[in-house]
Curated annotation (Swiss-Prot):
It comes from Chloroflexus aggregans (strain MD-66 / DSM 9485). Fe cation binds at C109, H152, H156. The keyword Cell wall biogenesis/degradation does not apply. This is Peptide deformylase. The gene is def. Belongs to the polypeptide deformylase family.
């Protein structure tokens, strides 16, 4: 496995690739398993929830998503895992149905680290995709973080960046500057 360089929206050459319409993946593909492993390693190293192949310079219809595990605090203060991490590999994904209702979400992207803005997304989506073996799947009514991530990553496969979805550009902000501006408490 290898950590790949994530292309950046604010780099002119990278942006050309990020704006491309990605080509479908022809399955089976012996090299795809290694690419997917590299993508997961890259995404984890960047503390992301999703990553699309064009973000690492490969304009194909492939994206990965991993929803972090959820924990519940016990009376003794310990944590138990109530929902394990959910990794998804979506090859040639197509959103085939949407809720018809939008919600505004604060959204960021590994291709523009530290920047967030309010983006309208469907409350749920149904997506069809293939897995690494070429088997077809349908994920119905994906909502919450998973539904949001699917919409974000599928946008990447069509050359659409999250900044293009922002309706009110005044919501786009660099949270690293917000963090730097916060007062630091003295430690004893």
């Amino acid at each position: 496995m290898a950590i790949r360089r994530i292309l950046r929206i604010d780099d002119a050459e990278d942006r050309k690739i990020l704006k491309m319409q990605c080509r479908p993946v022809k399955l089976p593909d012996r090299n795809l398993k290694q690419l997917v492993a590299d993508m997961f390693e890259t995404m984890h190293a960047a503390n992301g929830v999703g990553l699309a192949a064009p973000q690492i310079g490969i304009p194909i219809q492939l994206c990965i998503i991993e929803i972090p595990p959820e924990y519940e605090e016990q009376p003794d203060g310990s944590l138990i895992e109530v929902n394990p991490a959910e990794p998804y590999v979506l090859i040639n994904p197509r959103i085939v149905k949407t809720s018809g209702e939008e919600i505004m979400r604060d959204e960021g992207c590994l291709s523009l680290p530290g920047w967030y803005g309010m983006v309208p997304r469907q409350t749920w989506v149904t997506v069809e995709f293939q897995d690494l073996s070429g088997k077809h799947h349908r994920l119905r009514r994906a909502d919450g973080l998973l539904g949001w991530a699917i919409q974000h990553e599928v946008d990447h496969l069509h050359g659409i960046l999250f900044t293009e979805r922002i309706r009110d550009l005044s919501t786009l902000r660099d949270i690293t500057k917000e963090r730097e501006a916060q007062p630091v408490e003295a430690k004893a």
